[in-house]
Every structure is written in C-alpha cells, then in structure tokens.
Amino acid sequence: MIYLHAIDPIAFSLGPVKVHWYGLMYLAAFFSAWSLGRSRILRGRLPGVDMDGFSDLLFYGMLGVVLGGRIGYMLFYAFETFVANPLILFKVWEGGMSFHGGLLGVLVACWLWARKHRLHFFDVMDFVAPLVPLGLGFGRLGNFVGGELWGKFTQAGWGVIFPHAPELADQLPAQIQAQYAAGALNQLARHPSQLYEAALEGVVMFVVLWTFSMKPRARYALSGLFALLYGVFRFIVEFVRVPDAPIGYLAFNWLTMGQILSLPLIAVGLALLAMSRRAPVLQPVLPTPAGVEAAK
C-alpha cells in the first residue's frame, strides 16, 4: 500500500529545545559503535588497546564523522553555495552531511589515533569496519524520518509520497491528506531509497562484516570488504534515488556524484582484498583482568 509520509521530524521538545529524530539517530549510531567496539576490545581484536584507548578512538572517530561529513557535503554537493557564503559551513542545523566526506574524516582521525598509539593504520581500520554499518543504517532511517533524499517515482506497492518533494511543496498538509485519501496522489509515490540504503548499507553490511570478523582475518580484509560492499550498494541504490538538486546528473543522464564517489571505494576495496591474501593475520590478545574490570 502506498504510504503518505507524515512523520514529525521532531521527536520531542524540552522547553524551547526541539530534539530531532535525526539527532537521536546520531546518538544511536555512536552508542552502537561503542557497544560493538567494547565487545571487540574484550575479545582482544585490537591487541594492546583497552577501553580507555577505545573511548579515545571513538572520540576521534566522532569528530571525523561530523567535521568530515559537513566539509565533504560543502565540497562535493554545495561548493558554489559554500564559495558564495563560507559561513554556511557552520549552519549544521540546516542539514547537509556527506558519507564520503565523513569517511575521509574517519580515515584521517584513525590515522592520527593509530600514529599516536603506534599501531598499524589498517589494523585500526579493520577493527573499526564492523562497527560502522549499524550507524549508517541509523543515519538513513534519520533521512527517511526527515523526509529527505527521496527516490524516483515508482508505482510499486511500497512507494512513499513525500509532502516536501517539489511536486507537493506548495500545497497545505490538509490538501495533501485529502488528495491522498482519494487516491489522487498515487502517481507521485517515490522509492523509499533511504530505507533501501538502511537495509543494504546498515543491516546487510553489518551481518556480513560482523560475521566475517568473528574469526581472525588477514590485515586489509575487513577494510576491503567494507569499502567494496558500500561502494557497490551505494552505486546500485543511486539508480532509484533522485540526484542532489544543485548538481543533478553528471553524465549519460544517469551518473550521479554519489556513484562517482563510490567507484574509488569499489576499486580500493578490491585492491585491499587482493593485498590481504599475502598479509599477516592479527591474532587476538585478550585484555588483562584489570582491563576487563575497567570495561564493566
């Protein structure tokens, strides 16, 4: 049944402060990363690092996600707007985050943290890779709740009518509701591409990576698998997702910025998986009893 999107993006209010679902999804993402990371630390998946060290790594990662995601969005998707008004970079409440920018931010953050702790960069990235997909899934759910980043038109029974889409933006909620009840808006249903990405980049990637990480793997393998899966899934979903308005299609009337940015990920993923075939396997080293107590 075609669904009319009518979810309030505001979860609740505390006096004058309005708490948005998207912000809560970020909290859920960081909590899931902490919980999964704690489990991996207790199983010795990053030898020599205790919970204090992991908490430090998570803080670095959070900064990388937020700063990289925002800067990446400005550079990849709103560069002209940014050049005209550089201060818009700080208006995070207006929305605008890029996964690929966030990924670059996390890479820089993990490199700095690995250098600080004298660890191999890819040992750190292999540790982090299984912690990320659930956060991606929560982020896409936040996009859906916010009614943004919708897909192309579809007549599939699970299509969603988004009131903030251009074709309905000038109508009042009561008008939209009346037309929906009469079945007059069915032709305006769109692919819920946010949910497709939540399922693929969130659930599927988490199950695959977490299962794969249960046994010690060669260096580069987990990082390579993450990059490959994300690149492929994002490239596919872009075919049913409306391209970002300021940019549109970049070539062939179908190639999007998201697809162009995903191609290097696919190539890097394949290269890392090839490198892993000759790389050493990082054997787990269980933390000391004191470290286990500190994690409780």
From Swiss-Prot:
UniProt-listed GO biological process terms = lipoprotein biosynthetic process
Q: What is its EC number?
A: 2.5.1.145
Q: Which residues bind a 1,2-diacyl-sn-glycero-3-phospho-(1'-sn-glycerol) per the record?
A: R140
Stated name of the protein: Phosphatidylglycerol--prolipoprotein diacylglyceryl transferase
Q: How does it sit in the membrane?
A: Multi-pass membrane protein
Cellular component aspect of the GO annotation: plasma membrane
Q: Which enzyme type, at the first EC level?
A: transferase
Q: Where are the transmembrane segments?
A: 10-30, 57-77, 92-112, 119-139, 194-214, 220-240, 254-274
Q: Which HAMAP family match?
A: Lgt
Pathway the protein contributes to: Protein modification; lipoprotein biosynthesis (diacylglyceryl transfer)
The subcellular location is: Cell inner membrane
Instruction: Give the gene name.
Output: lgt
Q: What is the lineage of its organism?
A: Bacteria, Pseudomonadati, Pseudomonadota, Gammaproteobacteria, Lysobacterales
Could you tell me the superkingdom of the organism this chain comes from?
A: Bacteria
